[in-house]
């Protein structure tokens, strides 16, 4: 695997690795920074959509899809879910909120679905992460 692919995989599979670790061109870096800021400020909205993100980025949904796929290898919905799960891992580390509260804070309507997505993404449940299983 190429170094870029290894870094991308590490970002996707590790709960606390931030997207800033990925290497981009200056244009892509600015694009990702703006998108990440928008996601962070709107994360609680369970109905945040690809169309919302595309509108914020002044592009069509299909162009957003192509752009993200080219930069990080994920579509916008996958990237949004990953950003939500990574934010959840940060909140879990703070030990201030329950898993249910965190699931709602990051935009999941169902704590059960949140736990399922967390395990699928990182290989451990939120409870296991709290017990020291996270990176």
Predicted segments with their positions:
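Short helix/strand-capping hinge loops at secondary-structure junctions
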Residues: 42-47, 75-76, 96, 125-126
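Short hydrophobic/aromatic patch on the recognition helix
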Residues: 63-68, 113-114, 118
